[in-house]
Amino acid sequence: MFRLATLNDKPAILQLIAKYIHPNHVYVRRSDLFEYDFACADKLNIAVIEHDGSIEGIFGYFFYNYSLEPDIGGMLWISSDRAQKWSPLAGIQLRDFVLRSVKHRCFGAPGANVKTKIIYETFKKRWMPMEHFVCSLRPSSMPDFLKIRLEPLRMPKNICYVSQIRDFDEIKTLDPDIFYFQCPIKDLAYLCWRYFDNPFREYLLWRVDIGKTNMLVVIRIQNRGP
């Protein structure tokens, strides 16, 4: 049976993560981080495969915005050995259950392997790169579809003004259209949840101005916290 999870399912979900991902997974070590990422009142933004009272699969999701037809992203996808025996496509069916149950305009799969493209196409899904600003200290590790408009981090010929954003109110001074010209669309609630109120991850945000063009560059500080 497929259903949407509640907060009461947290212990069973963490057990599944420990068994099928790693017993020392960050969500297993820090259940408060798990709740920050997935809890919404007494619900969890997770769908589960349940059989005889046992949770045998999970598919997590999050909201990029809270419009009437929001963009959502998928994360934390597990299908147990038992679930695969019942149905080799149990994981795919669970993901499709989420897409049927959660109203949305666009579904994104951050970190999806290019090798899975044929699977999505088999199920008549449209494959397109997510238009994020992606940066790396190693150019060889950058994906082919990397899109940094006007390449602000590569010293464009235009005069480039860079300033660090230290307060959430400064985000509101950016041209809001920059969040609507890319997919997925991010709203202020997402930016606050992800980058400013997040007590578990540390980010640096930079405003880049080239002429009349505003850009937002986000850098995650690694190896701090969980």
Residue positions per predicted region:
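Short amphipathic alpha-helix that is part of the acyltransferase structural core
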Residues: 1-43, 48-50, 73, 148-190
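Tryptophan-centric aromatic hotspots in well-structured domains and transmembrane helices
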Residues: 31-38, 59, 125-127, 193
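A short catalytic or substrate-binding loop motif that flags glycine-/basic-rich loops and adjacent residues
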Residues: 39-43, 52, 185, 198-201, ...
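Short, high-confidence coil segments that cap the C-terminus of an alpha-helix
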Residues: 44, 102-104, 201-203
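Conserved beta-strand in the GNAT
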Residues: 48, 54-63, 73, 212-223
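Acyl-donor binding region in acyl/amide transferases
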Residues: 65-139, 222-226
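Oxyanion-binding "anion nests"
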Residues: 179, 183-207
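Flexible internal linker/loop segments at domain or repeat junctions
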Residues: 181, 185, 217, 222-226
